[in-house]
Amino acid sequence: KEDMIVLKKSEKMLSINDAIQKLIDSLKKITNDIIIVSDRDKVICSTDKNFLNENIDERVINAIDERKILDGINFKVGKKVIEGKFYMSPVIVEADALGSVIILSNKEINDKLIILNNVINVIISMKLY
C-alpha cells in the first residue's frame, strides 16, 4: 500500500513536469529566449534540452534559499557558462521555496520577459499547491 502512495506521488510529479515542459515550450515561441525551471539545485525543465538535469548557478541556489529575485549576466548551467542576461524568480508554495523560473536572453531583460517569468512562476505554484 505504501508503494502505491509513492507511485501516485511520482506519477503526479511526472505529469506536472510534462505540463510545465509544454508550457515553456509554447512560451518560447513568443520570446525565443531560453526558459529554465529548476528544483532547488538542478534543471527539471528547459527549452534547451542540453540543460536538463544539470546543476544550476550557485547564485540561483542562494536566491532560492533567500526567496529573492535575481538578475545578472553570464549564467552557469552545469559546467557551461551562458553569456547574456538572465532573470530568475523563486517558486514558492506555502512558504516553501521549491525551485526557480529562469529566463536567459541575449538582449536586455525587459518588462515583457519579467511578466512572462512571473506568469510561468504563478502557474507552477498553482500546479504544485
Describe these PLM feature segments.
Residues 2-5, 91-101:
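Short hydrophobic/glycine-rich mini-motifs in sensory/regulatory modules
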Residues 26-29, 79-83:
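Short loop/turn motifs at secondary-structure junctions and domain boundaries
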Residues 10, 40-42, 49, 106-108:
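Short, ordered loop/turn segments at secondary-structure junctions
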Residues 25-45:
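Short N-terminal helix-loop-first-beta-strand/juxtamembrane motif that initiates sensory/input modules
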Residues 40, 46, 52-80:
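Regulatory sensory and allosteric helical modules in signal-transduction proteins
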Residues 1-13:
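Short, structured interface segments
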Residues 81-92:
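A short beta-strand signature within small-molecule sensing/ligand-binding domains used
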Residues 12-27, 55-66, 72, 98-100, ...:
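Juxtadomain coupling helices with adjacent low-complexity linkers
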